[in-house]
A protein has these predicted regions:
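Active-site bordering "gate/hinge" segments
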Residues: 1-302, 306-309, 318-321, 399, ...
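Dual-mode signal for accessory low-complexity, basic/Gly-rich regions
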Residues: 210, 261, 275-449
Length: 449
């Protein structure tokens, strides 16, 4: 860490420690506080000209207090936050949190995580590198990507580049006080192509922890143009049941639905088709899904969760069997289970491939639909019913034949997960979910007729 960042972290730790001491004196039974600070730079270009240049610099402090009710058995909770960090604003925020807690109904599951579960192991995770690029650097990158995309038949809607860095400090009245750091860089191009009055749009993007690790501007622009050009002349296919291959970036959404279904809030609200499914076979026996909070440079690498609980590497799915939920301390108490270190979400979820590259999956599918985009919100997590608008390509003999749009793919997530045929080695690592493409034996497709 450079001296500037060290100084910022020490200042933030001092603020959090002072808040915790103050609310303790004010009579809070337990308390937690979180300070976060971030800065970023983003630019966009259009038609070879700079469109926007934006700089953000944000700070915030959130305070949560827990008060004992009259019989001392249950706790009530009050939270308040502020973006103004002078002593008067912080004092007012404490007042608000205390007042809200005094008015809130007590809950036997409220309170801090058990002290024994708080993190004591802090690994170097490679999640932060100082961002030294200037606005001119990002503008040059965006213009170069735009120029690479603006080839015959393709126009560029927008080219963009962004960098950011942030840190946060979390502390609670159990004596826990720790920080975490993050930096991000991303670049994207959105392109358009037209044929016979029909406009098609596609894009490509990349995201890393450090701008120097991004795909080159030229590659991003060329990929956006190629994908857009491929979509020209799209048509519908006849309704029916077909083999379906979800391209890796779209397959991530299927992993996302699984993660939602095993999250604590969905489970204790009886809003998940995977409630009471621990130990049940959900996927084929060849499938393993891991969670690795210690992945170096991972987008969701964490030594501790939002409750301060120690994270751990584990299997969510092992040999097709559901072996873990995603539980905060509160959710665990509601469900009568143990917390898993997932307050705030999952950490670097990795689906282990069992098949070859993308072209191998096309050959394995032989004839069917390749889905490259889904849209709409047709997912019912209570029942697992799935229905989304989609576009992509028709495939025959393992070869892409023509683009397809204005179709709907449907099924039930229970059946889809259980019937998964293959996961490709074409792993997309541009987010906290890492997976290759997913192949299904058949899905219901609504198109023409």
């Amino acid at each position: 860490l450079n001296q500037e960042m060290q100084n910022k972290i020490e200042m933030a730790k001092g603020i959090v420690a002072d808040v915790l001491e103050t609310v303790k004196r004010r009579g809070a039974f337990q308390a937690e506080a979180s300070y976060s600070e971030g800065s970023g730079l983003s630019v966009s270009t259009r038609s070879g000209q700079v469109d926007t240049v934006e700089h953000n610099d944000d700070r915030s402090l959130s305070i949560t207090v827990f008060l004992k009710n009259n019989d001392g058995e249950e706790l009530s909770k009050g939270s308040a936050s502020t973006a103004v960090l002078d002593p008067q604003a912080i004092a007012l925020t404490i007042e608000k949190a205390m007042a809200i807690a005094a008015l809130t109904e007590a809950d036997p599951c409220m309170g801090l995580a058990d002290k024994s579960r708080l993190a004591t192991e802090f690994r170097e995770l490679g999640t932060w590198q100082p961002q030294t690029v200037t606005a001119d650097d990002l503008i040059q990158r965006a213009l170069e990507a735009e120029a690479a995309a603006a080839t015959e038949g393709v126009t560029v809607d927008q080219s963009a580049a962004q960098t950011g860095e942030s840190f946060s400090v979390y502390g609670n009245s159990h004596g826990f006080l720790a920080h975490r750091l993050g930096s991000t860089a991303s670049a994207s191009v959105v392109a358009l192509a037209e044929q016979d009055g029909a406009m098609e749009r596609d894009y490509w993007w990349d995201a890393t922890r450090q701008v120097d690790d991004l795909l080159s501007a030229r590659e991003i622009g060329q990929k956006a143009a190629a994908r857009t050009r491929q979509r020209v002349g799209a048509r519908r296919v006849a309704s029916g049941a077909y083999p379906v291959l979800f391209e890796a970036p779209v397959a991530k959404t299927l992993v996302g639905h699984f993660l939602q279904a095993i999250s604590g809030s969905a489970l204790y609200q009886d809003a998940s088709f995977l409630k009471d499914a621990l130990g049940n076979r959900i996927f084929p026996d060849w499938l393993t899904i891991r969670e690795d909070p210690f992945l170096y440079g991972g987008f969701a690498s964490r030594n501790f969760d939002s409750d301060g609980v120690q994270t751990r590497a584990r299997h969510l799915i092992e040999n097709g069997v559901l072996s873990g939920y995603l539980l905060s301390s509160y959710a665990a108490r509601r469900l009568g289970l143990e917390p898993t270190g997932n307050a705030g979400g999952s950490h670097n979820v990795q689906v282990v491939p069992n098949a070859g590259e993308f072209t191998d999956l096309l050959q394995q599918m032989d004839t069917g639909l390749l889905i490259t985009e889904v849209m709409g919100q047709g997912i019912n997590l209570v029942t697992g019913d799935y229905s989304r608008g989609a576009s992509g390509f028709w495939v025959e003999n393992g070869q892409i034949q023509y683009p397809v749009n204005e179709i709907t793919v449907a099924g039930n997530l229970k059946d889809l997960y259980a019937g998964l045929q293959a996961v490709g080695s074409d792993v997309d690592r541009r987010s906290k979910i890492h997976t290759g493409s997913w192949l299904f034996e058949h899905m219901a497709v609504a198109g023409e007729g």
